Amino acid sequence: MRFLAYALALAAVLAAFPVAAAASPPPLAAWYMYGASAGALRSYAYAHGCDFAQDQPGTSLRVLLLDFGAARKIDSSTWGAVDFSDTTFSNADILGALERAADGYHNCHVRGSVDVVYGSSNYHLSGSGMSTTDAWYAGYHQSDRAEDLHDYQVSKGYTSQTSDAAGDLEPSWDGQLITKQLVNGDQGQGWALYYDFGSADGCPQSGSADGACNNGWHVSDVGYVSFHGLAVPLPEIYYSANASQWTVVRKWWDGAQSGDYFFGGVTGSTGVGLSPASAWSALESLNGGLVDAELVCFGC
């Protein structure tokens, strides 16, 4: 139901404002999360929430994406992520950080509203010993923590906030079967939209066929992890080729599936081939009217 509501709202916006859709939205920062301890992780998250609120332009809903690293099964009953300093945090630790991000956003709020998003990745899931069943539960518990965050936001009266989940899903990082289970687990829990802010590594740059991508993936697999169930594509567009690859994914989906594929926005970065604004414009130029006015940016 949340995905349907999101899709209907996006369709209304794109239909009502076809001219405005051609203008790149202002980029807002996303963060790779680090911390030597759970307390440090909470402190950084609070600061990021406050910074995001102070920088947020306009009155629309924007995505605050916090990427906690690679999804992991920590023990027989505990899931979480290993962060970018190779420190493992449980979902309880991550929820504590997400709540502090919500606090920071609320205390520094100026305008607009926010979707605070628990991000992780498919990096070396199988290499860490995780099975496809483990990956399903990782996605399930990620959505569950997003729902817990929403309960916290409601309990605090943070009426300008909501919450969701996300995955940096990249073909080169692990196989398509185990990666799909992250998306399936999220859908199984049922709360969170699952933004795919990953890549389409090695996929074709033209046509609409189910061509081969990196690591045994195909275009259809990228379509699945980005648009199946509660998944919403927020693709990594760092170079012009990426926009072309994702356009092939959209064309394949529209030709093979019953739904109309659209993009929830774009993930950009500093220090790459395209500026964040150019990244959004590159995808929009190939998919006119099908790219939402969202632009998250690592390094901004």
Predicted regions and their residues:
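Substrate-binding cleft and catalytic face of glycoside hydrolase catalytic domains
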Residues: 66-74, 104-130
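Surface-exposed, active-site-proximal loop segments in enzymatic domains
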Residues: 74-86, 127-136
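Surface-exposed substrate-engagement region within the catalytic domains
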Residues: 24-60, 81-108, 139-161, 172-300
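Positively charged n-region of N-terminal signal peptides that target proteins for export
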Residues: 1-5
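Conserved beta-strand positions
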Residues: 66, 167-169, 235
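Sec-dependent signal peptide cleavage junction
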Residues: 17-25
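Bacterial N-terminal signal peptides
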Residues: 6-16
